[in-house]
Amino acid sequence: MSSNIVLTVDVREGTGKGAARAARREDLVPGIVYGGKLDPVSVTLRGNEIRKALLGGHFLSNMIEIDHKGKRQTVIARDIQFHPVSDKAMHIDLYRVDEDTKINVNVAVNFTNEDACPALKRGGVLNIVRHDVELLCPAGSIPESVEADLTGLDIGDSLHISAIKLPKGVVPTITDRDFTVATLQGSRAVLTDAEEETDETPEEPEAIRQKGDEE
């Protein structure tokens, strides 16, 4: 997935908390660019550009172009720190990549075809174990989300990662087991109805036994 996010950066001369606070007073966000075969570089980014990019969603799973005096480089955001009160971006780590660089990213799981799920039709509940999954992806092919198809799943069934179709070249980072993404459970009402049906079934054999005793 290519990116349309472009962020302007400037090399940050000063380091330490004092320099970082001074940058934030100017609505600049301190950051670092690292990875590849180049040395890490301390930078500042425009606060308004960061806010706009964050509003667009999927900031941590998009390829980003950083522009320094007309020269561009492709990166991906690996971490972003926010102020605990104002929720403003405080620091960003940017990792240098190209189209084929393999990286670990958390990708959202979207559940589809709920209307074709017998468990939900019967009043069951979808218990989501993982709202997102960690995947190993080429930087140029990061999916925005993956789809988990609920078609045909009934109460008591589980949906595992092997049931989710992943794009070419994308694999789960957990490889030692077929981990669970969601389960289908009966609601309290469904379970109560089932228990009542179970309680009623012995009545007929009991009646037959009593009739035999009378004879």
Swiss-Prot record:
Biased composition (Basic and acidic residues): 206-215
Keywords from the UniProt entry: Ribonucleoprotein, Ribosomal protein, RNA-binding, rRNA-binding
Ranges of compositional bias, category Acidic residues: 193-205
GO biological process: translation
One GO molecular-function entry: structural constituent of ribosome
Transmembrane segments: none
Residues in the signal sequence: none
GO cellular component: cytosolic large ribosomal subunit
Keyword Hydrolase annotated: no
Subunit: Part of the 50S ribosomal subunit; part of the 5S rRNA/L5/L18/L25 subcomplex. Contacts the 5S rRNA. Binds to the 5S rRNA independently of L5 and L18.
Protein name: Large ribosomal subunit protein bL25
